[in-house]
Amino acid sequence: MTAHEVNFDGLVGLTHHYAGLSFGNEASTRHRFQVSNPRLAVKQGLLKMKALADAGFPQAVIPPHERPFIPALRQLGFTGSDEQILDKVARQAPRWLSSVSSASPMWVANAATVCPSADALDGKVHLTVANLNNKFHRALEAPVTEALLRAIFRDESQFSVHSALPQVALLGDEGAANHNRLGGEYGSAGVQLFVYGREEENEIRPARYPARQSREASEAVARLNQVNPQQVIFAQQNPEVIDQGVFHNDVIAVSNRQVLFCHEAAFARQKVLINQLRTRVDGFMAIEVPAGEVSVSDAVAPYLFNSQLLSRDDGSMLLVLPRECQDHAGVWRYLNKLVAEDNPISAMQVFDLRESMANGGGPACLRLRVVLTEEERRAVNPAVMMNDALFTALNAWADRYYRDRLTAADLADPLLLREGREALDVLTRLLDLGSVYPFQQTGAADG
């Protein structure tokens, strides 16, 4: 059956700021306390979406979350009106204010893991929400992510959205950032590669930074998504690269159809994995970047592998890269050599995503890939699909509500909270989502 990959990109939230919340993500740590520009951030993301949509790659949007997230502060024991809580936490525990104000939901590669209908035992598209429990600011996301996905993939005859796994370390799940699908045509059955960093009773794990994904979680997600057991491979990421800042697999590898583009040090027992894939995937091609040409640190710094690999109508592939790759002499030299060689990657497109990149999220972090047949695509909420009208409307919306300068101190401003809620209220109407945010369901009561 004919199917296409649709990229659902996250909209950057109104409280996008640099707080260094993500230990193990070196870009996040390096840019802590810099002044951010939320309006520029959301527009950089929109420009990427629109350019790719105009080039024939189907695009859609996933909205940001409510931030600052007052219910989480109430859970932590702060009381009073919303405004009083903001004032208290800013004075007593500013780190918590930064955490509940994180715009990290924009990196929707961590929103869920997706199984196309061609791979599912019941013939439906499955999405399992990620619990993201390694980081407090990200562990807040799952309930609203689930509500948003249900509002977008609302036809239960075509889609099954599953709640996140229990919030325990044993079941740490980071979503599609640790998942690859390989195969031929999108509409044909493929092989799903689940990548984990640790498993219980296995001492092979990183020493410096946490391994966020467990094998136990990956296996549970595969079951929830009803992936045909004959179409699954579980592989461990090389713990040594996790300790060099590769906190998700999409920082060291990217796949599309029959191609796996990765660093030669990406996986533990990489030769065994490559041979497995070669046996299971017709026409499989591994493009392994040698450390002698690009070191792991040189690949991580400009996010070489946090790129998008997209199929064009003629069968060739386009590599979508952050501008930082072009600015890195060694990486850019390697890439120009790559596209000149005999392989499916024949073109590159560079985007300025500086605001997201400084927090540790490149092109691949910003998108959730969903393979859909034409019938399934018609069943998606049409209001989220990117086109000229939506691009214009979202830019006008951003101009109205987003600030062009934000510091950690600004997060305590009650006006920022009100601006955000008003903006999301307008956005849910624009995207026909219904009442998906807690403040909409409670009337934003001060109690």
Swiss-Prot record:
Gene3D superfamilies: Succinylarginine dihydrolase. The keyword Signal does not apply. The active site is at 174, 248, 365 (nucleophile). It catalyses: N(2)-succinyl-L-arginine + 2 H2O + 2 H(+) = N(2)-succinyl-L-ornithine + 2 NH4(+) + CO2. Its EC number is 3.5.3.23. Substrate binds at residues 19-28, 110, 137-138, 212, 250, 359. It comes from the Bacteria. One of its GO terms (biological process) is arginine catabolic process to succinate. Coiled coil: none annotated. Keywords: Arginine metabolism, Hydrolase. It holds the Pfam family AstB. GO terms for molecular function: N-succinylarginine dihydrolase activity. Pathway: Amino-acid degradation; L-arginine degradation via AST pathway; L-glutamate and succinate from L-arginine: step 2/5. HAMAP family: AstB. Catalyzes the hydrolysis of N(2)-succinylarginine into N(2)-succinylornithine, ammonia and CO(2). PANTHER family: N-SUCCINYLARGININE DIHYDROLASE. Belongs to the succinylarginine dihydrolase family. Homodimer. This is N-succinylarginine dihydrolase.
